C-alpha cells in the first residue's frame, strides 16, 4: 500500500476545493484510505493518519472511528505518537463514552514517567476530559506532582487539581497541604495556577474559605510586589507587570474578604494603592482597575475607598471604548442601592449616556437613570427621561414608559405634576405602555378631586383629531364621561378655560366610536362615556339615546350588549339612571408590600410628600358602586380564598379599575384581606381540608396535558393539572415559574382571578425568587372548584423586580385543556 499523503498536502488539497460538494468528496476519499490503513494495523503511519483525522474533525466531519487509534498512540513509547494520541483523546473523547476509561492505566503510567513533557501531556488530558472515576483513581498522582520541585509540572498539576475538585469535591482536602506551599513559589505560572486552585476551593467549601483567610497577608504581599516591581520583559504587558496574575489575586481577595471584617481591613491599603497607581491609558490597566472596583464594592471596605471605586467607574463613563462604558454602567447599577449618594455625583454623565448610539449602553443608562430617581431630583430626571422617551427606538419605549410610571407614582411632588407626566407619556408612547397604565391613571385622576376640571380639559385638547394613542383616548373618554359637565362649564382654574359645547363633546366621542384606529375596548369606553353624559348634559339627551340605539345592532358583540343594556336603562329603568351613572367614588389603592420589604428612598434626605387632601372621614357607601359594576359586567368576580388571614386590609374595589372588563384580580395569600374587611364566603370542603397533604389526590385522573400560560421577557409560567376521580369538580393547578434571563427575578408574586361561577384558592408559593438561567423554578398550587363544569377562564397578574426595576403584567389564560374542566 502506498504511503499516505502528509497532513500539509491534505490541507493544501482541501483548500483548492471550489464547492462544498467537492470538498466532501475529497474528505470521503481520504477517510476511506485512513480506514483501510487502520484495518491493516499500520503502525508506521498511524500518527499521520490520526493527525489528518483531527483536522477533518475540526472542519466538522465525523471522526469517531479514530478513537481507538488514539488509545494505541497514547500507549506508544514515542513522544510524537503520545502527543498526537493525547490531542486526539481530548478532541474525540469525553466522559460520556466508555472508551475513555481504557486510558486510565496509560495516564497513570505517564504521570510517573521520567520525562516532564510526557507527564505534562498526561496532566493536560486528565485536566481536560477526566471523568469522576478517572479523577478518583489518579488524584494521588496529581497530588504528588503538586509537591515536586519542577515548576513546569507544578503549574500543570495545579490546574489538573482544579478539574479533580470540580469532579470529586470530597477529594479537596487531599490537596490542602500542597496548595499552601504553592504561594511561596517565585515562578509566576505556578503562582497564577495556585491562585486559581485556591479560588476554586474557597468557592466550593465554606470551611476552606475560613481556612484560607489567614493567607490574605501573603496574597497582599504578592500583589504589592507586582505593583512595586520594576520592568520585567518576561511579564510586562503595556507597562504593567503580569496583569493576569494581578486580576486573579484581586478576584481571590474579593472572595476572602466578603463578609469578613478582619480580611477586608487587611486588604484596604493595597486596594487603594492599586486604584491610585494603575495606569489607565491602556486597556490592561482598565481591566485591573475594574477588578479592583469589584473587589472594593464586594468586601467590607472603608467608605472613602468605596467613593474612590465609584469615581473610577465615573471615569470609565468618559472612556471612548464602548465596552468600558458598558461595564461601568453595569457596575454602577449593582452598587447604586448601597452607595447611592456617591453614584448621584455622576448623574449628569449617566444621563449623557442616554444619547449614545450603542443600544446596549443606552439600555443600561436608562436602567441606571431610573435607579437614581428620588424625591429631590424627580423633576430634572423626568425631564431627561421624557426627552429620551420621545426620541428613543421603539424597543425602549415600553420599559421607559413603565419606569416613568413607577417613579412618578413613588416620588411625584404634586398630583398635577403626576397627572401631567403620565399624560405626556401616553401622548408620546401610548401604544407601548402596559395594560395597567389606563386603570392606574384613572384611579389617580379619580382621587385628585381638585384636578378634575384641569385634567378633563387637558385630555380633551390632547385627543382633538388624533386617536392614534389608544390608551390616551381611553383615559380621555373615561374622564369626559365622568367630568363632562366640568368641561362644558369651563370651571378650570389651573389654566385658561376653553369654551366647549355639549354637541362638540359628543362629536369627539362619536368620532372615537367610528374611527378605524379605535379598538373594541376603546369603543366600549366611548359608548359608556356617552351614556354617562346623559346624566351630566341637559340639552343632548335625545342625541345620546339615538347614538346608543344605533350600536344596539353593532357587529361587535361586546359593544352591542352594552348598547342593548343602556337602551333598556333608558326605557325601563329611567328612574334609576341618575343613581347608576353617578360619579365614581374615590378608589383606594391596595398595596402589596410584604412586612419584610425594604423601602428604598434612593438617597433622598426626606421623603417627598405628595400634595393630597385628607380623605373623607367615615366609610364610603359601596352599594351604588356595586350596582354600577353589575350593570357594566364587572361584578361577576370571585375572590381568592386566602390560606391564612393576614393583618393587611384590602379595599373591595381597589384593583377593579377597568370598568369594561369582566374579570379583576385579587390578592395572593400574602396580601389577603382580613376577615373583618371582606364578607364571609361559604367555603367548599376541599378548601378547608388537607392543604398540606401530598399528594393532593390519591386517585388522579390521567392524561391532562400541561399548558404554557405566560411567556414574556424571559419569564415563563406553566400550568399542570390534576383532577380527582371521586370529586371531578375539583381541579388542582400547579404553576411553575422559570426565568431564562441572566439575572434573578425577586419579590415574585403570582395572583389569579376567575369568574363568579368558580371558587378559587391560591396556596403559598415555594419561594419569591425565580433563579436565572432556568436553574430553578417557583411552584404554587391553585385549587379551583367548578361545580357547573363550565369552561375555565382565568386572569393572572405577575409582579416582580428584575434588573433594578419593578415589573408588572396582566394576562388572560383561555387555553385550558377540556380535560381540566369537563
UniProtKB/Swiss-Prot annotation:
- Where does this polypeptide localize? Golgi apparatus; Cytoplasmic vesicle, Clathrin-coated vesicle membrane; Cytoplasm; Cytoplasm, Perinuclear region
Q: Where is the composition biased (Polar residues)?
A: 593-604
Q: How does it sit in the membrane?
A: Peripheral membrane protein
Q: Does the keyword ATP-binding apply?
A: no
User: What GO biological process terms are annotated to this protein in UniProt?
Assistant: basolateral protein secretion; intracellular protein transport; melanosome assembly; platelet dense granule organization; vesicle-mediated transport
Give the protein family. Answer: Belongs to the adaptor complexes large subunit family.
* UniProt-listed PANTHER family: ADAPTIN, ALPHA/GAMMA/EPSILON
Question: What is this protein called in UniProt?
Answer: AP-1 complex subunit gamma-1
Q: Which organism is it from?
A: Mus musculus (Mouse)
Q: What is the lineage of its organism?
A: Eukaryota, Metazoa, Chordata, Craniata, Vertebrata
Amino acid at each position: 500500500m502506498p504511503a499516505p499523503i502528509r497532513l500539509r498536502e491534505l490541507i493544501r488539497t482541501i483548500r483548492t476545493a471550489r464547492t462544498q460538494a467537492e470538498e466532501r468528496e475529497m474528505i470521503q476519499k481520504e477517510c476511506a484510505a485512513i480506514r483501510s490503513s487502520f484495518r491493516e494495523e499500520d503502525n508506521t503511519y498511524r500518527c499521520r493518519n490520526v493527525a489528518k483525522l483531527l483536522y477533518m474533525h475540526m472542519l466538522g466531519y465525523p471522526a469517531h472511528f479514530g478513537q481507538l487509534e488514539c488509545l494505541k498512540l497514547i500507549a506508544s513509547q514515542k513522544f510524537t505518537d503520545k502527543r498526537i494520541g493525547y490531542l486526539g483523546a481530548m478532541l474525540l473523547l469525553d466522559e460520556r463514552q466508555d472508551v475513555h476509561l481504557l486510558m486510565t492505566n496509560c495516564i497513570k503510567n505517564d504521570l510517573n514517567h521520567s520525562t516532564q513533557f510526557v507527564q505534562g501531556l498526561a496532566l493536560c488530558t486528565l485536566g481536560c476530559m477526566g471523568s469522576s472515576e478517572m479523577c478518583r483513581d489518579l488524584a494521588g498522582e496529581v497530588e504528588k506532582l503538586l509537591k515536586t520541585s519542577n515548576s513546569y509540572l507544578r503549574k500543570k498539576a495545579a490546574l489538573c487539581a482544579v478539574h479533580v475538585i470540580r469532579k470529586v469535591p470530597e477529594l479537596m482536602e487531599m490537596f490542602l497541604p500542597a496548595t499552601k506551599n504553592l504561594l511561596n513559589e517565585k515562578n509566576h505560572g505556578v503562582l497564577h495556577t495556585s491562585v486559581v486552585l485556591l479560588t476554586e476551593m474557597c468557592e466550593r467549601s465554606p470551611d476552606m474559605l475560613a481556612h484560607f483567610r489567614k493567607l490574605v497577608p501573603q496574597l497582599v504581599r504578592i500583589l504589592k510586589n507586582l505593583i512595586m516591581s520594576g520592568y520585567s520583559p518576561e511579564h510586562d504587558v503595556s507597562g504593567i507587570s503580569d496583569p493576569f496574575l494581578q486580576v486573579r489575586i484581586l478576584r481571590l481577595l474579593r472572595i476572602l474578604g466578603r463578609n469578613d471584617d478582619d480580611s477586608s481591613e487587611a486588604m484596604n491599603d493595597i486596594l487603594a494603592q492599586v486604584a491610585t497607581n494603575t495606569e489607565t491609558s491602556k486597556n490592561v490597566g482598565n481591566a485591573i482597575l475594574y477588578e479592583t472596583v469589584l473587589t472594593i464594592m464586594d468586601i467590607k471596605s472603608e467608605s472613602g475607598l468605596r467613593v474612590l471605586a465609584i469615581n473610577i467607574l465615573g471615569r470609565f463613563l468618559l472612556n471612548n471604548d464602548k465596552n468600558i462604558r458598558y461595564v461601568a454602567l453595569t457596575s454602577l447599577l449593582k452598587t447604586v442601592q448601597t452607595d447611592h449618594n456617591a453614584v448621584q455625583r455622576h448623574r449628569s454623565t449617566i444621563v449623557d449616556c442616554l444619547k449614545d448610539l450603542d443600544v446596549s449602553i443606552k439600555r443600561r443608562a436608562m436602567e441606571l437613570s431610573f435607579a437614581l430617581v428620588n424625591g429631590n431630583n424627580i423633576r430634572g430626571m423626568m425631564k431627561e427621561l421624557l426627552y429620551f422617551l420621545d426620541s428613543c427606538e421603539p424597543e425602549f419605549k415600553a420599559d421607559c414608559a413603565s419606569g416613568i410610571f413607577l417613579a412618578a407614582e413613588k416620588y411625584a411632588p404634586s398630583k398635577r405634576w403626576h397627572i401631567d407626566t403620565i399624560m405626556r407619556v401616553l401622548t408620546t408612547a401610548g401604544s407601548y405602555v402596559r395594560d395597567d397604565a389606563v386603570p392606574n391613571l384613572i384611579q389617580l385622576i379619580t382621587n385628585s378631586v381638585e384636578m378634575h376640571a384641569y385634567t378633563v380639559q387637558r385630555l380633551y385638547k390632547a385627543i382633538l383629531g388624533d386617536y392614534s394613542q389608544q390608551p390616551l383616548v381611553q383615559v380621555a373618554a373615561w374622564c369626559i364621561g365622568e367630568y363632562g359637565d366640568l368641561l362644558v362649564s369651563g370651571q378650570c382654574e389651573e389654566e385658561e378655560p376653553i369654551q366647549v359645547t355639549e354637541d362638540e363633546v359628543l362629536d369627539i366621542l362619536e368620532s372615537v366610536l367610528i374611527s378605524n384606529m379605535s379598538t373594541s375596548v376603546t369603543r366600549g369606553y366611548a359608548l359608556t362615556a356617552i351614556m354617562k353624559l346623559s346624566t351630566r348634559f341637559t340639552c343632548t339627551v335625545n342625541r345620546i339615546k339615538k347614538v346608543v340605539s344605533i350600536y344596539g345592532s353593532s357587529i361587535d358583540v361586546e359593544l352591542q350588549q352594552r348598547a342593548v343594556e343602556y337602551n333598556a336603562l333608558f326605557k325601563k329603568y329611567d328612574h334609576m339612571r341618575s343613581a347608576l351613572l353617578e360619579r365614581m367614588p374615590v378608589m383606594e389603592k391596595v398595596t402589596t408590600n410584604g412586612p419584610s420589604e425594604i423601602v428604598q428612598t434612593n438617597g433622598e434626605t426626606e421623603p417627598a410628600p405628595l400634595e393630597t387632601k385628607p380623605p373623607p372621614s367615615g366609610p364610603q357607601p359601596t352599594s351604588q358602586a356595586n350596582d354600577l359594576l353589575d350593570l357594566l359586567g364587572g361584578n361577576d368576580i370571585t375572590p381568592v380564598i386566602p390560606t391564612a388571614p393576614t393583618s393587611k386590609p384590602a379595599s373591595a374595589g381597589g384593583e377593579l379599575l377597568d370598568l369594561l372588563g369582566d374579570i379583576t384580580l385579587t390578592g395572593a395569600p400574602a396580601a389577603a384581606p382580613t376577615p373583618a374587611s371582606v364578607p364571609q364566603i361559604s367555603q367548599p370542603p376541599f378548601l378547608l381540608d388537607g392543604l398540606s397533604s401530598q399528594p393532593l389526590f390519591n386517585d388522579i385522573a390521567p392524561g391532562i396535558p400541561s399548558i404554557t400560560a405566560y411567556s414574556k421577557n424571559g419569564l415563563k409560567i406553566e400550568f399542570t393539572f390534576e383532577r380527582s376521580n371521586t370529586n371531578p369538580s375539583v381541579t388542582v393547578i400547579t404553576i411553575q415559574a422559570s426565568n431564562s434571563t441572566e439575572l434573578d427575578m425577586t419579590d415574585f408574586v403570582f395572583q389569579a382571578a376567575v369568574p363568579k361561577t368558580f371558587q378559587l384558592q391560591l396556596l403559598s408559593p415555594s419561594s419569591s425568587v425565580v433563579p436565572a438561567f432556568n436553574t430553578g423554578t417557583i411552584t404554587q398550587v391553585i385549587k379551583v372548584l367548578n361545580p357547573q363544569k363550565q369552561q375555565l377562564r382565568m386572569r393572572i397578574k405577575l409582579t416582580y423586580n428584575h434588573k433594578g426595576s419593578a415589573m408588572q403584567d396582566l394576562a388572560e389564560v383561555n387555553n385550558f385543556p377540556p380535560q381540566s374542566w369537563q
